[in-house]
Amino acid sequence: MRIEKCYFCSGPIYPGHGMMFVRNDCKVFRFCKSKCHKNFKKKRNPRKVRWTKAFRKAAGKELTVDNSFEFEKRRNEPVKYQRELWNKTIDAMKRVEEIKQRRQAKFIMNRLKKNKELQKVQDIREVKQNIHLIRAPLAGKGKQLEEKMVQQLQEDVDMEDAS
């Protein structure tokens, strides 16, 4: 069973699904859904349509260069069936998929980490600019007034003791 890739959005096309367009020069285009086919007929560039994988990779939102993608290459050489080889291949596919998922998650977290740092710097700058909203201009005056009141009370007590 071969799972093809959509020409427009790079999504998976399972056997019996999607549609195929064959141009006069025998170039084959496979589409997963009518939305992709319509956009192809309108001559839209997949790298400029925001929901396609081509856009996400071109914009740096997804992992583009990695050794795990080498395993997905199309191979047209038939291999003689051997049960042991088949089992090893399936185990290797699971392992490669697991590694790929981990690397993609790490890539996304690193990409989001930059934004968190920028947001933190921007928040600090905003607080420094608007510090007067947080700290009232008379905030330190309360203690000074309290100290003056205490001094006046002590002076009054001293005056009464002296008389």
Curated annotation (Swiss-Prot):
The residues that cross the membrane are none
Family as reported in the entry's similarity comment: Belongs to the eukaryotic ribosomal protein eL24 family.
GO molecular function term, any single one? structural constituent of ribosome
Taxonomy, superkingdom: Eukaryota
Q: How does it assemble?
A: Associated with nucleolar and cytoplasmic pre-60S particles. At the end of biogenesis it dissociates from cytoplasmic pre-60S particles and is likely to be exchanged for its ribosomal homolog, RPL24.
User: What organism does the UniProt record list as the source?
Assistant: Rattus norvegicus (Rat)
Q: Identify this protein by name.
A: Probable ribosome biogenesis protein RLP24
PANTHER family cross-referenced by the UniProt entry: 60S RIBOSOMAL PROTEIN L24 (PTHR10792), RIBOSOME BIOGENESIS PROTEIN RLP24-RELATED (PTHR10792:SF8)
**Hey, what's the signal peptide range on this chain?**
none
Query: Record's CDD domains?
Result: Ribosomal_L24e_L24 (cd00472)
**Which Pfam families did the record assign?**
Ribosomal_L24e
Give the main location: nucleus
Q: Which cysteines are joined by disulfide bonds?
A: none
* Record key words, sorted: Nucleus, Ribosome biogenesis
**Classification via SUPFAM superfamilies:** Glucocorticoid receptor-like (DNA-binding domain) (SSF57716)
Purpose:
Involved in the biogenesis of the 60S ribosomal subunit. Ensures the docking of GTPBP4/NOG1 to pre-60S particles.
